[in-house]
């Protein structure tokens, strides 16, 4: 992989909320404490339904006059009506802006980040440039220091600059997995509880007060355990073959989970093939440093 290059990843879910009460509305629907979020700040969060299940996972980027929720593609049709349902008398308007932007991811070591991060973001975590209609967001999708660039199609200068210095989206999967950034619709969906992702400290405030789904989150926090959890894994396949997600993890004839995302690790030191992955694993098997020889001879290491 050429670490000097970024990644062109296409359209994402981009939801815009405007109005004086926009952050109040989001705070009532998110696990993160957004009561005091200021322009230029970014917060990672879950959006929950009334039962405390994960409707989405992504980042909230606050600007001077509007706030964006950004996540994996294909969610706006569900999320916009969900948010709008809870706007009653508040000064807030929600709309789908997904098709207006094309996304580029720039890791901290990429040529673009080295040359332009300071100019585009300064000391902020997000900013909007009217000159080229570009939204820049600090989002740890490929690790701390990653910049997500949302460029409008008509911003040809930015488009040309980014496209010439970016690979297609296929190459970024390994970095996303190693950075433990779950992808909604792949690693998690509406069946999951937020604590099953194992990123509580990044995404959940236990002190913010009431929000939609809060009772379920608080109850699970009091119990202190989940029945399954997303974990970082490495797999060593004895044969030099492929691994397609979802990949079932079977130990002594019993399913202990599924690999939800996987990317091959280049190595000349071992026979067969090595894979990094994210896996939803049953309780009793997802503890870090656990190691299992699965049925079929696959060696699973939980990291």
Question: Model-flagged regions — what are they?
Answer:
Residues 1-57, 61:
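Acidic, proline/glycine-enriched N-terminal capping motif
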Residues 49-65, 234-242, 283-284:
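Active-site beta-strand->loop segment that positions catalytic residues and contacts the acyl thioester
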Residues 175, 192, 198-204, 212-214, ...:
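Glycine-rich, small/acidic residue-mixed loop/short-helix segments
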Residues 18, 72, 151-152, 236, ...:
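Solvent-exposed residues in well-ordered beta-strands and their adjoining turns
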Residues 27-35, 75, 81-89, 222, ...:
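Short, intrinsically disordered, mixed-charge
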Residues 19, 108, 213:
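Short, conserved phosphate/pyrophosphate- and ester-handling motifs at nucleotide-, phospho-/glycolipid
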Residues 5-14, 59-182:
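Acidic, low-complexity central loop/insert segments
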């Amino acid at each position: 992989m050429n670490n000097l290059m970024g990644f062109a990843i296409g359209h994402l879910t981009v939801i815009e909320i405007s109005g004086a009460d926009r952050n109040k509305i989001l705070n009532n629907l998110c696990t993160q404490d957004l009561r005091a979020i200021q322009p230029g700040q970014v917060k990672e969060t879950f959006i929950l339904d009334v039962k405390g299940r994960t409707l989405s996972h992504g980042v909230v980027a606050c600007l001077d006059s509007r706030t964006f929720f950004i996540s994996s593609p294909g969610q706006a049709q569900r999320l916009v009506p969900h948010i709008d349902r809870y706007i009653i008398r508040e000064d807030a308007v929600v709309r789908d802006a997904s098709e207006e932007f094309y996304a580029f991811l720039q890791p901290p070591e990429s040529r673009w980040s080295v040359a332009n991060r300071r100019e585009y973001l300064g000391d902020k975590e997000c900013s909007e440039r009217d000159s080229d209609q570009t939204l820049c967001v600090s989002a740890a999708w490929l690790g701390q220091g990653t910049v997500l660039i949302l460029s409008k199609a008509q911003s040809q200068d930015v488009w040309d600059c980014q496209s010439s210095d970016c690979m297609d989206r296929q190459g970024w999967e390994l970095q996303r997995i190693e950075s433990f950034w779950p992808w909604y619709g792949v690693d998690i969906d509406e069946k999951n509880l937020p604590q099953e992702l194992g990123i509580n400290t990044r995404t959940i405030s236990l002190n913010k007060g009431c929000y939609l789904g809060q009772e379920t989150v608080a109850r699970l926090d009091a119990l202190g355990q989940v029945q399954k959890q997303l974990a970082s894994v490495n797999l060593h396949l004895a044969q030099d073959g492929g691994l397609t997600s979802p990949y079932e993890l079977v130990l002594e004839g019993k399913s202990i989970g599924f690999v939800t995302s996987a990317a091959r690790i280049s190595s000349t030191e071992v026979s067969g093939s090595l894979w990094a992955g994210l896996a939803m694993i049953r309780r009793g098997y997802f503890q870090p440093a656990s190691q299992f020889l699965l049925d079929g001879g696959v060696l699973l290491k939980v990291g």
